[in-house]
């Protein structure tokens, strides 16, 4: 093979390996700006966050949506305002339904206050109506969505107590609720149709992922045709068993067994963590707790996602790299952001140009 041909081949191979979805969660942006925060590029020039993200290689932004939050933060209007900025910047949008008035995660999946009295069938209909309405609002505002997650980290279920796994009809109810959400998206006015994601935590635990999908799919109320993506959260600072090796095995197994795209919906790495509450996984010990370490971590995670068979590993999302007022991002580490407290971007954000 002649050198130009070899170089062309190598370039093509590299291009093919790039992730289709290289993203960050930027949900907190409007709150931060209201508090007076500004963002600066590497030269120290103030720019809109979306401009800095785009120039750093980010192509998709993730946004959480809550049903009726008491302060209106993360509600539908908030998300439309934020999404308009993403669209103007040429960024794709991944909308993350929490189906709650506040945070929904493995520790809590609280049914919205206005829905609390609904029995199962009425709740299933409410999820359909709400989801379809949200899709219609995005469509009427001329905003397309690339990904929609029907629930956030729903490993224990969603919309408790009706959709709580491990309780009576829990699995069948979870399946019915998710089926309803999926059908609402497919039957909504939004066009083109977004990819539908189911998102669980602990992406490194293959046995948990398999148990969840096998349990819910076995009810017959939800089928593989109802979703396109399996999203996972994968953090290094909550469990020493969360090794890169375990993560790589888990996502590979997921794609092989279920045939869906696999996406890391959330991840972080700290640049400062003097007193972690949990030991970091053994095979991450060579990655420094630093800005350079953030780059190494993202490359290691992306490498395992792109290695998933059949090109099924399609995305990695860094959770809230610009939330200056919440630098620990819920962990025991002091700084997980990719921006300094002065709003200046750290060099680590540019890793999105190389994954």
Summary of predicted features, one role per range:
Residues 19-92, 98-127, 231, 237:
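N-terminal substrate-binding region of glycoside hydrolase catalytic domains
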Residues 24, 53, 96, 148, ...:
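Conserved, mostly hydrophobic/aromatic
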Residues 1-18:
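Fungal secretory targeting signals
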Residues 26-29, 66-68, 98-100, 150-155, ...:
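Active-site beta-loop-alpha junctions enriched in small/polar residues
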Residues 36-54, 79, 127-137, 206-220, ...:
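Short, acidic/polar
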Residues 34-40, 44-45, 253, 272-355:
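Aromatic-rich peripheral "rim/lid" segments of glycoside hydrolase catalytic domains that contact
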Residues 49-50, 187, 193-195, 210-283, ...:
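Glycoside hydrolase catalytic-domain groove-lining segments
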């Amino acid at each position: 093979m002649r050198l130009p041909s070899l170089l062309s081949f190598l370039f093509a191979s590299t291009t093919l390996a790039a992730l289709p979805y290289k993203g960050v969660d930027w949900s907190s942006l409007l709150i931060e700006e209201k508090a007076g925060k500004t963002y600066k590029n590497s030269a120290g020039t103030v720019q809109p966050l979306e401009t800095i993200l785009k120039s750093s290689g980010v192509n998709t932004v993730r946004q959480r949506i809550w049903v009726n939050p008491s302060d209106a933060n993360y509600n539908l209007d908030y998300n439309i305002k934020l999404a308009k900025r993403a669209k103007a910047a040429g960024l794709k949008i991944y909308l993350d339904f929490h189906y709650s008035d506040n945070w929904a995660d493995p520790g809590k999946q609280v049914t919205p206050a206005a829905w609390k009295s609904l029995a199962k069938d009425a709740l299933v209909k409410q999820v359909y109506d709400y989801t379809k309405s949200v899709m219609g609002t995005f469509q009427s505002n001329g905003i397309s969505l690339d990904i929609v997650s029907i629930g956030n980290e729903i490993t224990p279920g969603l919309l408790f107590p009706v959709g709580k796994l491990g309780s009576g009809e829990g699995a069948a109810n979870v399946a019915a609720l998710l089926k309803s959400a999926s059908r609402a998206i497919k039957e909504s006015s939004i066009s083109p149709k977004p990819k539908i994601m189911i998102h669980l935590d602990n992406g490194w635990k293959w046995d948990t992922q398999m148990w969840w999908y096998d349990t819910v799919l076995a009810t017959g109320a939800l089928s593989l045709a109802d979703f396109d993506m399996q999203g996972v959260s994968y953090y290094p600072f909550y469990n020493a068993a969360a090794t890169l090796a375990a993560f790589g095995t888990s996502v590979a197994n997921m794609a092989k067994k279920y045939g869906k795209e696999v996406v890391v919906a959330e991840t972080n790495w700290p640049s400062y963590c003097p007193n972690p509450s949990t030991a970091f996984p053994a095979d991450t010990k060579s990655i420094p707790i630093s800005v350079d370490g953030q780059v190494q971590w993202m490359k290691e995670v992306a490498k395992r996602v792109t290695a998933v068979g059949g090109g099924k590993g399609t995305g990695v999302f860094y959770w809230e790299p610009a939330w200056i007022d919440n630098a620990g991002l819920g962990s025991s580490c002091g700084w997980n952001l990719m921006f300094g407290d002065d709003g200046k971007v750290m060099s680590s954000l540019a890793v999105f140009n190389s994954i």
